[in-house]
């Protein structure tokens, strides 16, 4: 059994990760200020919840002693929110990540697994992005924050001997996602609109490609990244299915009416994962196809319409 700290452990991905860590018998501490996460109404038995801020040294000193590894998920997410609030999101996402790495060094914590984002790639012509060859060109503050975080992790591994791994997530969905709010993820937003008998609002022309990845696959990648002997030197590893779909195709899979609305600033055209590195270094591969994951969510939300399967794959 290991003792893990999960920053942002009350959020969407964090809650799923914490549940799995507990199921595997690990001791878990959650540090969260509940800005994006939920105060622990969804308390997981056996987990220590600490309300605090990753930018605060004293809060980190409360939770880091005796920890074997840190899953660093805490952030102010979403591209549009960062466009509207660049200073605040920089402070949390960049300075907060630096403070977590400094705390890991101070408390001699062996490994940090950092949650990055495919948005850090920026605008790319390729539909499947390769970690070590794509030249990253962030086009939003949030994307830049994650790019900086990746580089801080690499530097801390090389200069200070802190084992780090950066997992690059591609459009995650699944249980505990939040369908509410102006910055809700597209699948959650669409399913909520369907439940309310509203048309799905598609930004731009709907031909942006996204690589939708189920949160259970992301959780598995995190645990593998924490335990694999093949990583720890600041590696960048894509975590995505490798089968990008357009937003218009997503609408067809969900089923229902849609309307087009203006494109959002900061959105990239193509976002898909070449996951070869994850397979080779982590022994990871995706297990839940988009159609299956959508069907599961629709059942959870009481939506009985059946998934429509695509006739053409990308």
Stretches with model-predicted labels:
Residues 49, 71, 78, 86, ...:
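Generic anion/oxyanion-binding catalytic loop in active/binding sites
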Residues 1-172, 300, 314:
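N-terminal Rossmann-like NAD(P)+-binding domain of SDR-like oxidoreductases, especially those catalyzing
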Residues 76, 80-83, 143, 184-187, ...:
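Glycine-rich phosphate-binding loop at the start of an alpha helix
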Residues 195-314:
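C-terminal substrate-binding subdomain of Rossmann-fold SDR/epimerase-dehydratase oxidoreductases
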Residues 126-128, 151-210, 215-226, 242, ...:
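NAD(P)-dependent short-chain dehydrogenase/reductase
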Residues 43, 56, 179-183, 243, ...:
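Residue-level signature of the cytosolic catalytic core of signaling kinases
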